[in-house]
């Protein structure tokens, strides 16, 4: 089970990578968008890992036997929770007047950042 310090560290790294991906690939430069991405990419993994801690769900931490992409259900959950959190926050917040594909791309890039950090960095 991950300690709270590790969860916070991983979520902070997720937020940083999500902001970089959204700024570089998604070409979003608005401070409001980038702050929202950081908040969502931090909050999603924290929420998911809090659920895993509260339920002592250790079986979610088994990595797939794929050396180049050893993803686990825990990693996947962090990405999915970040994606969902970002879709809601961005869609109701700073990107509410943008086309849905821009909201979806920004949320997807943020979720991807959370997934990659989870798989490779903690």
Regions found by a protein language model. Give the residues of each.
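Juxtamembrane/disordered regions of integral membrane proteins
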Residues: 1-35, 39, 46-122
């Amino acid at each position: 089970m991950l300690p709270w310090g590790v969860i916070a560290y991983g979520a902070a790294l997720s937020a940083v990578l999500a902001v970089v991906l959204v700024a570089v690939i998604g070409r979003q430069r608005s401070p409001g968008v980038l702050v929202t991405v950081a908040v969502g990419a931090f909050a999603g993994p924290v929420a998911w890992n809090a659920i895993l801690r509260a339920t002592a769900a250790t079986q979610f931490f088994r990595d797939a036997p794929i050396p180049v992409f050893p993803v686990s259900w825990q990693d996947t959950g962090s990405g999915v929770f970040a994606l969902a959190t970002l879709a809601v926050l961005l869609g109701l917040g700073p990107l509410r007047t943008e086309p849905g594909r821009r909201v979806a791309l920004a949320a997807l890039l943020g979720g991807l950042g959370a997934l990659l950090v989870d798989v490779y960095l903690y």
